[in-house]
Structures are given as C-alpha cells and as structure tokens.
Amino acid sequence: MSPPQHVAGVCGSLRDASYTRIALDHALQAAEDCGAPTTLVDLRGYDLPVFDTDHREAGDAARLQEDIQRADSVLLGSPMYHGSYAAPLKNALDYCGFDEFENTTVGLLAVAGGSFPTMTLEHLRSVCRALNAWVLPHQAAIPTASEKFENG
C-alpha cells in the first residue's frame, strides 16, 4: 500500500477570523482523519512583498515554494473578493510556478459573504491549469459563510 498523500492547504485570506481558514481547517482535519499528513500554509505567516519579476526570491518566497513542493496535493482556499480570488493568494501563486504545481493534484475551496463564489473557483481553476496542475473536477464553495459557521 502506498503511503498517505501529504496535503497542503493554502489560505488566501489574511483576516484573523477568516471563514476560509476555518473551512480549510475542517478540510485538512478530514484528510488527517483519513491518515494523510497535512500542513496549513497560512499566508499571514509569510513575508511576501508584491511580486516583482526582478526580485523573484524576495522575502519568504523560497519557504513558500518549499512548503508547497513538499505536498503531494494542494488545497487552495480563498474568499471571494469582487468576483475573484483574494490578492494575497494571487501574490503567493505569482511566486510559484511549474516546479510547485506541475502534475500536482489541486483542490479548490472558495468562501463568500454573499452569493455563490462561482467566479472565484473558475479563476483559480484557470490559473492552476496554466501551471499544469491536475485540478479536481469537484470543488467546495461556501456562500453566505457567516450563516454557515458558528464558533468555528
């Protein structure tokens, strides 16, 4: 039997009481319950200046890349902002590339304060495909998140 797949959940929200982080914690706990080791890549803990191609190794870029490369599968989580995914996640993905995502299985999770976050998921799917990742056909979406979570 093959060893369990290591799953990294990348939280694209910087908010302290983030519904995205809560949802990722639940998803990662479910993976752990199935025997998979997990890592939460919480972007609040990384120094990632706005991406500049002249400074690809700025801040904690190397640590972010290593944390994602170490995983067999990646779950990207983002709140919906103006119909798309959050800038911190976009910035983190800009520091990554084929080395981190090519042939990696990627799951998508989006959280919205209002309507269904369809566009967020579609945008993330397009970015992951451009990185040659294997994006799961099923995705997780949580509309009206404040009504779904009570005390975590």
How does the language model describe each region?
Residues Y46, A110-S115, T144-E147:
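Acidic, glycine-rich active-site loops and adjacent beta-strand->loop/helix elements
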Residues H6, E102-N103, N151-G152:
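Glycine-rich NAD(P)-binding loop of Rossmann-like domains
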Residues S2-P3, R63, V135-G152:
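Glycine-rich phosphate/pyrophosphate-binding loop and the adjoining helix
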Residues L48-F51, F101, I142, F149:
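Short clusters of hydrophobic/aromatic residues that line enzyme substrate/ligand-binding pockets
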Residues M1-N91:
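N-terminal beta1-alpha1-beta2 submodule of the flavodoxin-like/Rossmannoid cofactor-binding fold
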Residues G59-W134:
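Helix-loop-strand module that forms the ligand-binding subsite of alpha/beta enzymes
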Residues C34, E102-T104, H138-A140:
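A generic structural signal for short beta-strands and their flanking turns/coil linkers
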Residues V10, G107-L109, L136, A140:
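Hydrophobic/aromatic beta-strand patches that form the interior of the parallel beta-sheet core
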